Amino acid sequence: MQLSIQAIIGFVVAAGLAVASELPSPMTVNLERRKMLVTKNDTVDFKAVRKQANALNYKYDKLLRNFRKNTGRDHPLLHLLLDLIDKRDGKGDVDLDDIGEGQLWAGDVQFGQSKFKIDFDTGSADTLVNPFVYFPHRSKSSRKTHHTFSTAYGDGTTASGFIYTDDLKIGGYKAKDVAIGLSVTKFINDEDNQGIAGMSFPAVQSFPKKFDPFFVALVKQKVVPEPVFQFTLKRGSGSTLHLGGIDNSRFQGELSYVDVNPEDGFWISEGKVNGKKIDACIDTGSSIIFGPIDEVREVITKMDGVTPFTAGGALHGAFDCSKPPKLDFEFAGQKFNLGENQVSFGKYQGQCVLSIMGQKNLPMNAWVVGDSFLQTASVVFDMGKNRMGFAPSSN
Protein backbone atom coordinates (compact mmCIF):
# COMPACT_ATOMS: atom_id res chain seq x y z
CA MET A 1 0.00 0.00 0.00
CA GLN A 2 1.33 3.41 -0.96
CA LEU A 3 0.73 6.38 1.29
CA SER A 4 0.26 9.92 0.02
CA ILE A 5 2.88 12.53 0.82
CA GLN A 6 0.37 14.23 3.13
CA ALA A 7 -0.19 11.01 5.08
CA ILE A 8 3.53 10.49 5.42
CA ILE A 9 4.11 14.07 6.52
CA GLY A 10 1.27 13.81 9.01
CA PHE A 11 2.76 10.64 10.47
CA VAL A 12 6.21 12.20 10.65
CA VAL A 13 4.89 15.33 12.37
CA ALA A 14 2.92 13.27 14.89
CA ALA A 15 5.86 11.01 15.61
CA GLY A 16 8.14 13.99 15.85
CA LEU A 17 6.16 15.52 18.70
CA ALA A 18 7.48 12.84 21.01
CA VAL A 19 11.08 13.70 20.22
CA ALA A 20 10.74 17.42 19.59
CA SER A 21 13.48 18.24 22.02
CA GLU A 22 15.93 16.20 19.93
CA LEU A 23 15.16 17.98 16.67
CA PRO A 24 17.45 20.70 15.39
CA SER A 25 16.27 24.27 15.19
CA PRO A 26 15.08 25.78 11.90
CA MET A 27 17.95 26.76 9.63
CA THR A 28 18.48 29.63 7.21
CA VAL A 29 20.16 29.52 3.82
CA ASN A 30 21.41 32.87 2.55
CA LEU A 31 20.46 33.48 -1.07
CA GLU A 32 22.15 35.42 -3.84
CA ARG A 33 20.45 36.78 -6.94
CA ARG A 34 22.24 35.53 -10.02
CA LYS A 35 21.47 37.61 -13.13
CA MET A 36 18.95 40.27 -14.04
CA LEU A 37 17.00 40.89 -17.24
CA VAL A 38 18.61 44.27 -17.84
CA THR A 39 21.88 45.57 -19.21
CA LYS A 40 24.34 47.63 -17.20
CA ASN A 41 22.50 50.89 -17.94
CA ASP A 42 19.21 49.40 -16.64
CA THR A 43 17.82 48.89 -20.16
CA VAL A 44 15.59 45.84 -20.55
CA ASP A 45 17.31 43.03 -22.42
CA PHE A 46 14.32 41.76 -24.39
CA LYS A 47 16.40 38.91 -25.79
CA ALA A 48 16.99 37.67 -22.23
CA VAL A 49 13.30 38.22 -21.40
CA ARG A 50 12.27 36.17 -24.41
CA LYS A 51 14.68 33.39 -23.43
CA GLN A 52 13.28 33.24 -19.92
CA ALA A 53 9.72 33.29 -21.23
CA ASN A 54 10.50 30.41 -23.59
CA ALA A 55 12.28 28.50 -20.84
CA LEU A 56 9.33 28.97 -18.47
CA ASN A 57 6.87 27.84 -21.14
CA TYR A 58 8.81 24.64 -21.73
CA LYS A 59 9.37 24.15 -18.03
CA TYR A 60 5.63 24.23 -17.33
CA ASP A 61 4.89 22.15 -20.39
CA LYS A 62 7.22 19.46 -19.07
CA LEU A 63 5.75 19.71 -15.56
CA LEU A 64 2.22 19.29 -16.94
CA ARG A 65 3.39 16.24 -18.86
CA ASN A 66 4.93 14.92 -15.65
CA PHE A 67 1.60 15.50 -13.92
CA ARG A 68 -0.20 13.46 -16.58
CA LYS A 69 2.39 10.67 -16.31
CA ASN A 70 2.29 10.62 -12.50
CA THR A 71 -1.48 10.91 -12.00
CA GLY A 72 -3.04 9.55 -15.18
CA ARG A 73 -5.07 12.73 -15.75
CA ASP A 74 -4.67 16.21 -17.15
CA HIS A 75 -3.98 19.09 -14.81
CA PRO A 76 -7.12 21.14 -14.02
CA LEU A 77 -5.39 24.33 -15.22
CA LEU A 78 -4.00 22.79 -18.42
CA HIS A 79 -4.31 25.12 -21.42
CA LEU A 80 -2.19 23.46 -24.09
CA LEU A 81 0.93 21.38 -24.51
CA LEU A 82 3.68 22.58 -26.81
CA ASP A 83 5.07 20.58 -29.72
CA LEU A 84 8.23 19.41 -27.99
CA ILE A 85 11.00 17.42 -29.56
CA ASP A 86 10.93 14.08 -27.80
CA LYS A 87 14.36 12.41 -27.57
CA ARG A 88 13.48 9.35 -25.52
CA ASP A 89 16.95 7.84 -25.74
CA GLY A 90 18.53 10.96 -24.23
CA LYS A 91 21.25 10.98 -26.89
CA GLY A 92 22.40 13.66 -29.32
CA ASP A 93 24.09 17.01 -29.11
CA VAL A 94 22.17 19.47 -26.95
CA ASP A 95 23.22 23.11 -26.80
CA LEU A 96 21.65 24.52 -23.65
CA ASP A 97 24.10 27.29 -22.78
CA ASP A 98 21.41 29.92 -23.22
CA ILE A 99 18.83 28.09 -21.10
CA GLY A 100 17.85 29.33 -17.67
CA GLU A 101 19.93 32.51 -17.84
CA GLY A 102 20.59 32.14 -14.12
CA GLN A 103 17.43 34.05 -13.22
CA LEU A 104 16.90 32.33 -9.88
CA TRP A 105 17.98 32.57 -6.26
CA ALA A 106 21.04 30.52 -5.36
CA GLY A 107 22.40 29.15 -2.09
CA ASP A 108 24.98 26.62 -0.95
CA VAL A 109 24.42 22.86 -0.79
CA GLN A 110 26.63 19.79 -0.56
CA PHE A 111 25.97 16.38 -2.10
CA GLY A 112 28.52 13.84 -0.92
CA GLN A 113 31.88 15.61 -1.15
CA SER A 114 30.75 18.11 -3.80
CA LYS A 115 29.86 21.65 -2.72
CA PHE A 116 28.19 24.14 -5.07
CA LYS A 117 25.55 26.83 -5.37
CA ILE A 118 22.14 25.80 -6.57
CA ASP A 119 18.95 27.66 -7.44
CA PHE A 120 15.88 27.02 -5.28
CA ASP A 121 12.76 26.82 -7.43
CA THR A 122 9.23 26.53 -6.05
CA GLY A 123 8.00 25.98 -9.61
CA SER A 124 9.59 22.55 -10.11
CA ALA A 125 10.26 19.39 -8.11
CA ASP A 126 13.57 17.78 -9.13
CA THR A 127 17.19 18.51 -8.24
CA LEU A 128 19.41 18.76 -11.33
CA VAL A 129 23.01 19.91 -11.77
CA ASN A 130 25.39 20.71 -14.61
CA PRO A 131 28.13 18.24 -15.55
CA PHE A 132 31.44 18.39 -13.65
CA VAL A 133 29.76 19.85 -10.56
CA TYR A 134 28.74 16.77 -8.64
CA PHE A 135 31.40 14.04 -8.56
CA PRO A 136 29.79 10.76 -7.42
CA HIS A 137 33.07 8.81 -7.55
CA ARG A 138 34.45 11.02 -4.76
CA SER A 139 31.64 10.09 -2.38
CA LYS A 140 31.39 6.80 -0.49
CA SER A 141 27.67 7.44 0.08
CA SER A 142 26.86 7.98 -3.62
CA ARG A 143 24.72 5.43 -5.43
CA LYS A 144 23.99 5.34 -9.16
CA THR A 145 20.37 4.29 -9.54
CA HIS A 146 20.46 3.45 -13.27
CA HIS A 147 17.36 5.60 -13.70
CA THR A 148 17.56 8.45 -16.20
CA PHE A 149 15.89 11.85 -16.42
CA SER A 150 15.01 14.04 -19.38
CA THR A 151 13.97 17.67 -19.17
CA ALA A 152 12.84 19.94 -22.02
CA TYR A 153 13.97 23.52 -22.50
CA GLY A 154 13.04 26.54 -24.56
CA ASP A 155 14.79 25.56 -27.79
CA GLY A 156 12.89 22.28 -28.00
CA THR A 157 15.86 20.14 -26.96
CA THR A 158 16.29 18.08 -23.82
CA ALA A 159 18.84 17.76 -21.06
CA SER A 160 19.39 14.19 -19.95
CA GLY A 161 21.43 12.25 -17.46
CA PHE A 162 21.47 9.68 -14.66
CA ILE A 163 19.87 9.92 -11.24
CA TYR A 164 22.11 9.34 -8.23
CA THR A 165 21.38 9.33 -4.51
CA ASP A 166 23.76 10.76 -1.95
CA ASP A 167 23.97 12.48 1.41
CA LEU A 168 22.73 16.08 1.28
CA LYS A 169 23.90 18.89 3.54
CA ILE A 170 22.00 22.16 3.46
CA GLY A 171 21.71 24.95 6.00
CA GLY A 172 23.10 22.76 8.79
CA TYR A 173 20.79 19.83 8.00
CA LYS A 174 21.87 16.45 6.68
CA ALA A 175 19.73 13.85 4.92
CA LYS A 176 20.67 10.50 3.44
CA ASP A 177 20.00 9.08 -0.03
CA VAL A 178 18.60 12.26 -1.57
CA ALA A 179 18.08 12.14 -5.34
CA ILE A 180 20.19 14.31 -7.65
CA GLY A 181 20.15 14.31 -11.44
CA LEU A 182 23.60 14.72 -13.03
CA SER A 183 23.18 16.16 -16.51
CA VAL A 184 25.48 15.15 -19.36
CA THR A 185 25.04 18.61 -20.89
CA LYS A 186 25.33 22.11 -19.46
CA PHE A 187 21.89 23.64 -18.98
CA ILE A 188 22.62 26.71 -16.84
CA ASN A 189 25.03 29.29 -18.20
CA ASP A 190 26.29 30.70 -14.92
CA GLU A 191 29.72 30.00 -13.44
CA ASP A 192 28.53 30.57 -9.88
CA ASN A 193 25.24 28.69 -10.00
CA GLN A 194 25.31 25.10 -11.19
CA GLY A 195 21.88 23.58 -10.72
CA ILE A 196 18.23 23.74 -9.73
CA ALA A 197 16.59 22.34 -6.59
CA GLY A 198 12.84 21.99 -7.05
CA MET A 199 10.54 22.60 -4.08
CA SER A 200 7.11 21.81 -5.55
CA PHE A 201 5.08 18.69 -4.79
CA PRO A 202 5.90 15.19 -6.12
CA ALA A 203 2.93 15.19 -8.53
CA VAL A 204 4.98 17.19 -11.06
CA GLN A 205 8.39 15.59 -10.62
CA SER A 206 10.25 14.01 -13.53
CA PHE A 207 12.06 11.51 -11.33
CA PRO A 208 10.40 8.16 -10.51
CA LYS A 209 8.11 8.33 -7.47
CA LYS A 210 10.57 6.61 -5.15
CA PHE A 211 12.95 9.59 -5.45
CA ASP A 212 11.50 12.36 -3.30
CA PRO A 213 12.12 16.07 -3.88
CA PHE A 214 14.88 17.15 -1.50
CA PHE A 215 12.67 18.97 1.02
CA VAL A 216 10.25 16.04 1.15
CA ALA A 217 13.27 13.84 1.93
CA LEU A 218 14.23 16.18 4.79
CA VAL A 219 10.69 15.89 6.16
CA LYS A 220 10.43 12.10 5.85
CA GLN A 221 13.77 11.63 7.60
CA LYS A 222 12.61 13.93 10.42
CA VAL A 223 15.59 16.18 9.83
CA VAL A 224 13.55 19.39 9.96
CA PRO A 225 11.40 20.28 13.00
CA GLU A 226 8.45 21.30 10.82
CA PRO A 227 7.49 20.56 7.17
CA VAL A 228 7.71 24.26 6.37
CA PHE A 229 10.01 26.54 4.41
CA GLN A 230 9.95 30.29 3.96
CA PHE A 231 11.24 32.54 1.19
CA THR A 232 12.04 36.19 1.83
CA LEU A 233 13.49 37.83 -1.27
CA LYS A 234 14.91 41.33 -1.29
CA ARG A 235 16.35 43.67 -3.85
CA GLY A 236 20.07 43.55 -3.09
CA SER A 237 21.31 41.64 -0.04
CA GLY A 238 19.34 39.95 2.72
CA SER A 239 17.41 37.28 0.78
CA THR A 240 16.91 34.01 2.65
CA LEU A 241 15.39 30.55 2.47
CA HIS A 242 14.35 29.47 5.97
CA LEU A 243 14.00 25.70 6.40
CA GLY A 244 12.02 23.84 9.04
CA GLY A 245 10.02 26.67 10.58
CA ILE A 246 8.94 30.30 10.39
CA ASP A 247 11.20 33.28 11.03
CA ASN A 248 8.84 35.96 12.36
CA SER A 249 11.53 38.62 12.05
CA ARG A 250 11.28 38.42 8.26
CA PHE A 251 7.80 39.94 8.02
CA GLN A 252 5.49 42.58 9.46
CA GLY A 253 2.16 41.83 11.13
CA GLU A 254 0.53 38.42 10.84
CA LEU A 255 0.65 35.77 8.15
CA SER A 256 -2.51 35.30 6.10
CA TYR A 257 -2.98 31.78 4.77
CA VAL A 258 -4.51 30.23 1.67
CA ASP A 259 -5.02 26.52 1.14
CA VAL A 260 -3.19 24.67 -1.62
CA ASN A 261 -3.93 21.27 -3.11
CA PRO A 262 -0.76 19.15 -3.13
CA GLU A 263 -2.36 16.83 -5.67
CA ASP A 264 -2.09 19.69 -8.18
CA GLY A 265 1.69 19.63 -7.83
CA PHE A 266 2.22 23.40 -7.77
CA TRP A 267 2.05 26.12 -5.13
CA ILE A 268 -1.11 27.59 -6.68
CA SER A 269 -3.53 30.02 -5.09
CA GLU A 270 -6.44 32.16 -6.11
CA GLY A 271 -5.55 35.83 -5.92
CA LYS A 272 -6.17 39.23 -7.42
CA VAL A 273 -4.11 41.70 -9.42
CA ASN A 274 -5.50 45.24 -9.27
CA GLY A 275 -8.78 43.66 -8.23
CA LYS A 276 -8.96 41.14 -11.08
CA LYS A 277 -9.31 37.52 -9.96
CA ILE A 278 -6.53 35.21 -11.11
CA ASP A 279 -5.03 31.79 -10.45
CA ALA A 280 -1.39 32.29 -9.45
CA CYS A 281 1.53 29.90 -9.29
CA ILE A 282 4.09 31.27 -6.82
CA ASP A 283 7.40 30.60 -8.57
CA THR A 284 10.81 31.66 -7.27
CA GLY A 285 12.19 30.57 -10.63
CA SER A 286 10.72 33.54 -12.50
CA SER A 287 12.25 37.01 -12.46
CA ILE A 288 9.06 38.79 -13.44
CA ILE A 289 5.35 38.02 -13.66
CA PHE A 290 3.81 36.25 -16.65
CA GLY A 291 0.11 35.91 -17.37
CA PRO A 292 -2.30 34.95 -20.15
CA ILE A 293 -2.12 37.76 -22.69
CA ASP A 294 -5.84 38.65 -22.62
CA GLU A 295 -5.88 38.88 -18.83
CA VAL A 296 -2.72 40.99 -18.76
CA ARG A 297 -4.12 43.28 -21.46
CA GLU A 298 -7.25 43.78 -19.35
CA VAL A 299 -5.12 44.81 -16.36
CA ILE A 300 -2.74 47.05 -18.32
CA THR A 301 -5.45 48.95 -20.21
CA LYS A 302 -7.06 49.94 -16.91
CA MET A 303 -3.82 51.32 -15.44
CA ASP A 304 -3.42 55.08 -15.54
CA GLY A 305 -0.41 56.25 -17.52
CA VAL A 306 0.56 52.81 -18.87
CA THR A 307 0.93 52.28 -22.62
CA PRO A 308 0.77 48.71 -23.97
CA PHE A 309 3.44 47.60 -26.45
CA THR A 310 4.68 44.35 -27.93
CA ALA A 311 8.25 43.06 -27.86
CA GLY A 312 9.43 39.56 -28.67
CA GLY A 313 5.86 38.39 -29.14
CA ALA A 314 4.88 39.36 -25.58
CA LEU A 315 2.65 42.15 -24.29
CA HIS A 316 4.33 44.74 -22.07
CA GLY A 317 3.42 48.09 -20.54
CA ALA A 318 5.49 51.30 -20.47
CA PHE A 319 5.08 54.31 -18.19
CA ASP A 320 6.76 57.53 -17.10
CA CYS A 321 9.35 56.49 -14.52
CA SER A 322 8.54 59.54 -12.39
CA LYS A 323 4.88 58.47 -12.16
CA PRO A 324 4.76 54.76 -11.29
CA PRO A 325 1.26 53.26 -11.61
CA LYS A 326 -0.66 51.41 -8.92
CA LEU A 327 -0.02 47.68 -9.11
CA ASP A 328 -1.04 45.41 -6.27
CA PHE A 329 -1.55 41.72 -5.68
CA GLU A 330 -3.92 40.25 -3.14
CA PHE A 331 -3.61 36.85 -1.48
CA ALA A 332 -5.59 35.57 1.49
CA GLY A 333 -7.34 38.93 1.72
CA GLN A 334 -4.07 40.82 2.17
CA LYS A 335 -2.89 43.37 -0.39
CA PHE A 336 0.71 43.81 -1.45
CA ASN A 337 1.55 47.01 -3.28
CA LEU A 338 4.47 46.80 -5.65
CA GLY A 339 6.79 49.69 -4.87
CA GLU A 340 8.84 51.78 -7.25
CA ASN A 341 11.57 49.12 -7.43
CA GLN A 342 9.11 46.28 -8.06
CA VAL A 343 6.56 47.81 -10.43
CA SER A 344 9.22 48.03 -13.15
CA PHE A 345 12.10 45.72 -14.05
CA GLY A 346 13.98 48.07 -16.39
CA LYS A 347 13.76 50.83 -18.98
CA TYR A 348 12.99 51.00 -22.69
CA GLN A 349 13.26 54.13 -24.84
CA GLY A 350 13.36 56.37 -21.79
CA GLN A 351 10.34 54.83 -20.07
CA CYS A 352 9.97 52.19 -17.40
CA VAL A 353 8.72 48.72 -18.34
CA LEU A 354 5.96 47.21 -16.21
CA SER A 355 6.94 44.05 -14.34
CA ILE A 356 3.98 42.03 -15.63
CA MET A 357 3.85 40.71 -19.17
CA GLY A 358 1.32 38.77 -21.23
CA GLN A 359 1.99 35.74 -23.39
CA LYS A 360 -0.06 33.78 -25.87
CA ASN A 361 -0.35 30.02 -25.59
CA LEU A 362 0.83 29.61 -22.03
CA PRO A 363 0.74 25.94 -21.00
CA MET A 364 -1.40 26.76 -17.93
CA ASN A 365 -4.40 29.00 -17.45
CA ALA A 366 -2.61 30.71 -14.60
CA TRP A 367 -0.22 33.54 -13.83
CA VAL A 368 3.38 32.74 -12.97
CA VAL A 369 4.13 35.12 -10.10
CA GLY A 370 7.83 35.69 -9.55
CA ASP A 371 10.33 38.13 -8.10
CA SER A 372 8.51 41.40 -8.68
CA PHE A 373 5.84 40.28 -6.24
CA LEU A 374 8.07 38.16 -4.00
CA GLN A 375 10.27 41.15 -3.17
CA THR A 376 7.30 42.67 -1.35
CA ALA A 377 6.37 39.66 0.78
CA SER A 378 7.66 36.89 2.97
CA VAL A 379 5.98 33.67 1.86
CA VAL A 380 5.64 30.52 3.95
CA PHE A 381 5.20 27.19 2.16
CA ASP A 382 3.62 24.71 4.57
CA MET A 383 3.66 21.10 3.34
CA GLY A 384 2.24 19.83 6.61
CA LYS A 385 -0.99 21.83 6.49
CA ASN A 386 -1.08 22.29 2.69
CA ARG A 387 -1.13 26.05 2.70
CA MET A 388 0.82 29.20 1.90
CA GLY A 389 1.20 32.13 4.25
CA PHE A 390 1.73 35.71 3.09
CA ALA A 391 2.85 38.80 4.98
CA PRO A 392 4.62 42.05 4.03
CA SER A 393 8.36 41.58 4.35
CA SER A 394 10.16 43.52 7.07
CA ASN A 395 12.36 46.43 6.10
UniProtKB/Swiss-Prot annotation:
EC numbers on record: 3.4.23.-
Organism listed in the record: Malassezia globosa (strain ATCC MYA-4612 / CBS 7966)
Record bears the keyword Metal-binding: no
Keywords (A to Z) from UniProt: Aspartyl protease, Disulfide bond, Glycoprotein, Hydrolase, Protease, Secreted, Signal
One Gene Ontology term of the molecular function aspect: aspartic-type endopeptidase activity
First-listed, main subcellular location of the protein, grouped into a coarse class: secreted
Glycosylation sites: N41
GO annotation, biological process: proteolysis
The UniProt record lists the keyword Secreted: yes
Cysteine pairs bridged by disulfides in the record: C321-C352
Activity regulation as described: Inhibited by pepstatin A.
Protein name (record): Secreted aspartyl protease 1
Family according to the record: Belongs to the peptidase A1 family.
One Gene Ontology cellular component annotation held by this UniProt entry: extracellular region
UniProt signal peptide: 1-20
SUPFAM superfamilies per the UniProt record, alphabetical: Acid proteases
Maturation propeptide residues: 21-88
Its biological purpose: Dominant secreted aspartyl protease that has a clear preference for aromatic residues in the P1' position directly adjacent to the cleavage site and, in particular, Trp. In addition, it generally cleaves peptides containing Lys, Arg, Phe, Tyr, or Nle (norleucine) in the P1 position, Nle and Glu at P2, and Arg and Val at P2'. Has important roles in facilitating the interaction of the yeast with the external environment. Is able to rapidly hydrolyze Staphylococcus aureus protein A, an important S.aureus virulence factor involved in immune evasion and biofilm formation.
Subcellular location: Secreted
Inducing factors: Highly expressed during exponential growth in rich media. Also part of the 3 most highly expressed extracellular proteases in minimal media. Expressed on human skin.
Domain Peptidase A1: 105-391
